[in-house]
Amino acid sequence: NLTIMNNITLAPVKLKLMSEEEAKENALKLLKRVGLEEKADAYPASLSGGQKQRIAIVRSLAMNPRVMLFDEPTSALDPEMVGEVLEVMKELAESGMTMVVVTHEMGFAREVGTKVLFMDGGNIVEENTPQEFFTNPKSPRLQEFLSKVL
C-alpha cells in the first residue's frame, strides 16, 4: 500500500518523465490545486470517496496529459461529495484542459461543456452546443430523456 504522494509520483518517475524530486514538487502543486496537500502522506483507505476521486484526477494530471477522459466520475460518490469533484473538473476546463466526460450530471454538462453528445444504444443520437442541446433538442429520444431528468 502506497501513500498518496507515492501513488502520484510512481508513474512519472518509473517512466522517467521526471526525477523523483520534480515529481514530488509537481505532486504537491497538484494536491494544492485540488485542496488536498495535507493528504500527501496519508493512505488511500483514510480518504473519503470524493477525496479518492480528486486524488485519481491528480494522478492523471501528474502525467501532463493533453486530454483527460472521465467515465461517470461522480456516480459512486455520496451526493455530498459530488460537488467537490465537479468543482475540480470545472477548474480544469477553465484552465484549458480538453476533457471527454461521460456523465448524467446535466447541470455540469450544460455549464462546463462546449459540445454535448447524447448516446442511446451505443449510437450518437444528437450532438450540439450546450445551449442548443438543452433548449432545443431535435430528436424525440433526447426530448424524452431531458423531460425525465431536468
Feature annotation, model-predicted:
Residues 43-47, 51:
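Conserved ABC ATPase signature
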Residues 103-104:
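H-loop/switch region of ABC-family ATPase nucleotide-binding domains
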Residues 68-71:
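Catalytic Walker B motif of ABC-type/P-loop ATPase nucleotide-binding domains
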Residues 62-66:
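A short, proline-enriched helix->beta-strand linker immediately N-terminal to the Walker B motif
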Residues 1-10:
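Short coil-to-helix segment of the ABC ATPase nucleotide-binding domain corresponding to the Q-loop/switch region
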Residues 79-81:
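Helix N-cap at the start of a conserved alpha-helix in ABC-type nucleotide-binding domains
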